[in-house]
Amino acid sequence: MSKIGLFVGTTTGKTEEAAEKIKEEFGGDDVVTIHDISEASPEDFDGYQNVIIGCPTWDVGELQSDWSGFYSEELDNVKFTGKKVAYFGTGDQIGYADNFQDAMGILEEKITGLGGTTIGSWSTEGYDHEDSKAVKNGKFVGLALDDDNQADLTDERIKEWVKQLKTEFGV
């Protein structure tokens, strides 16, 4: 089994594409296994001490549909105590400036309440948004990606974030 479980939901494919880039930056299948949250069960989290959650913000500050279903039906049954959890999200900071990356913040708050330890916070510098549920103590709770307005920064952001996570995960 790989060292990191990456659980992702996607509608347009952008979040899944980012997940693949994150996996490759870590070193591929030997290190990261990607799980589609629409097909995942709470038991799929059991084998991992290191977890990455990937979710786009959908509509106006909402969870993407696959995550919404898992959130309401399954998330409370995941044993997060003792797990390090990193988050990344995709969104549009210009079109949805008042709720950029809210889904990441919604999931982080819930998972922290279930015992997960958040790692991988990310600076808000270089972003142009008004508000976000994903900002705590002046930083995003995880990596914020915006392929609608800053696609040219995505690869470098992923590279830097994974470098940070390798240290924080201890892998």
From Swiss-Prot:
Top-rank taxon: Bacteria
Keyword Transmembrane: no
Presence of the UniProt keyword Translocase in the record: no
Every Flavodoxin-like domain range: 4-166
One GO MF term: FMN binding
InterPro entries: Flavodoxin, Flavodoxin/NO_synth, Flavodoxin_lc, Flavoprotein-like_sf
The protein's role, per its UniProt record: Low-potential electron donor to a number of redox enzymes.
Family affiliation: Belongs to the flavodoxin family.
PANTHER family named among the record's database cross-references: FLAVODOXIN 1, FLAVODOXIN 2
Protein's recorded name: Flavodoxin
